Amino acid sequence: MLVAHMGGPYWSGKDDAAWSIPKGEYDAESEPPLDAARREFREELGVAPPDGEYTDVGTFVYSSGKRVTVFAVDGRAFAASGFTFGEFELEWPPRSGRRQSFPEVDRAEWMPLDAARPRLMKGQRPALDALVAHLAASVPLAGLSG
C-alpha cells in the first residue's frame, strides 16, 4: 500500500497514526471522484498516479463528517520515487505572526498492509479493512479450487 507521511511541524517525528492515503477535497457536482483522486495524487506527490484499472474501495466518513472515497489500483510497476510534494502555508510558531511553507507530505513509500495499519490515521483504517476484504475476495488462495 502506498502511503504518505504528513508534513509540517505537527507531524515531524511522529510515525504512528501520522501516515495517510493520498487524498483531498473535491466538488462532487463538477468532478467525478476518481478524477479528483487522480488529481489529488498528482498535487500531493508531484507525479502521475499509476495507470491501470481502478477499483472503488468505498466511501468512508471521518468523525469530523468529512467523506473520503478511496480507490485502489495495482501499483506493482509504480516506483515510489521522484516525488515533488505540494506545499501549504502555516503560521509557525503559533501566534508568532510568521508564515512558513511546509510540504503537505514529507515522504511516501510502499508498506505491507499490516505495517500500514498502525501508521495510518485512525479515520483511514476502515478503508484499509475494506481494501483487505476486497483483495481477499478477488485473489484466489493458492491450493484452492472452485
Located regions from the model:
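N-terminal strand-loop-strand
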Residues: M1-P22, P49, F71
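Short loop segments at secondary-structure junctions
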Residues: G7-G8, D74-F78, L113-A115
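Residues that scaffold the ATP/ADP-binding catalytic core of kinase and kinase-like folds
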Residues: G13, E29, R119
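Residues that flank catalytic or metal-binding motifs in active/ligand-binding sites
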Residues: A17, R67, E104
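The catalytic Nudix box helix
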Residues: I21-V57, P112
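Active-site-adjacent beta-strand/loop module that shapes the phosphate/pyrophosphate-binding cleft
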Residues: T59-G97, E109, L131
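Non-DNA-binding regulatory cores of transcription-related proteins
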Residues: Q100-D106
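Charged phosphate-binding loop/patch that engages nucleotide di/tri-phosphates or the phosphate backbone
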Residues: E109, L113-G146
